[in-house]
């Protein structure tokens, strides 16, 4: 038996996904700041909860301008539920790096989402600014879990939806 606390998400810590249009839902900026431990030059968020949703993906409390005052970076742990799709979008003027901790995911990308790349646990992924892409969990039973780092401290404000045949009504 482990002495470490159980940090698995419970139903009480999960949020509802964002409404159509992809806007994030979840904790307020004040709640995010309240979860941050400021050590005077080094800041920490301990045992972050899953509390925000965006475009079919759940995010643990991460670090961004909203809670640590970062200027150029944000970072989260993202969970793509079994069988879920994060509909096509682009990152405007910022880079994204991912490290897949668990699961298998497909990125369909390109102007018409005509290209694809499959990734699994242990893979690093780099997404250039402005590349249209859609994220698909390849399993109907297991989530994809990834560390996501962005060269944008605002997280979702500079993400734009693009057409997708999978998007409801789109």
Predicted regions, residues:
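Residue-level recognition of conserved beta-strand positions in structured domain cores
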Residues: 77, 90, 101, 109-111, ...
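Conserved metal-binding segment of the jelly-roll/cupin
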Residues: 80-83, 109, 119-138, 150-151
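Conserved short histidine dyad/triad with adjacent acidic residue
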Residues: 76-92
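Short strand-connecting beta-turns/loops that link adjacent beta-strands
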Residues: 67-68, 93, 112, 140-142
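A short hydrophobic beta-strand segment most commonly corresponding to one strand
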Residues: 75-78, 97, 126, 141-158
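A short, N-terminal "cap"/entry segment at the start of jelly-roll beta-barrel domains
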Residues: 2-72, 87, 157, 161-170
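A short beta-strand-loop-beta hairpin characteristic of the jelly-roll/cupin
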Residues: 85, 94-121
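Short, charged/polar surface micro-motifs in flexible loops or helix N-caps
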Residues: 67-71, 80-84, 102-106, 152-154
């Amino acid at each position: 038996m482990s002495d470490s606390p159980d940090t698995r998400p419970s139903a009480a810590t999960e949020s509802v996904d964002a409404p159509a249009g992809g806007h994030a839902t979840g904790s307020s900026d004040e709640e995010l700041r309240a979860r941050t431990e400021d050590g005077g030059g080094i800041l920490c968020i301990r045992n972050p909860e899953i509390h925000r949703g965006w475009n079919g993906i759940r995010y643990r409390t991460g670090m961004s301008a909203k809670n640590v005052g970062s200027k150029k970076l944000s970072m989260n742990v993202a969970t793509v539920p079994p069988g879920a799709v994060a509909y096509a979008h682009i990152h405007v003027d910022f880079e994204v790096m991912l490290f897949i901790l668990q699961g298998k995911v497909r990125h369909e990308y390109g102007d018409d989402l005509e290209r694809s790349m499959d990734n699994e646990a242990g893979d690093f992924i780099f997404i250039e600014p402005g590349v249209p892409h859609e994220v698909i969990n390849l399993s109907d039973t297991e989530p994809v879990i990834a560390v996501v780092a962005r060269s944008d401290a605002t997280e979702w404000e500079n993400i734009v939806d693009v057409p997708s045949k999978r998007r409801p009504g789109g």
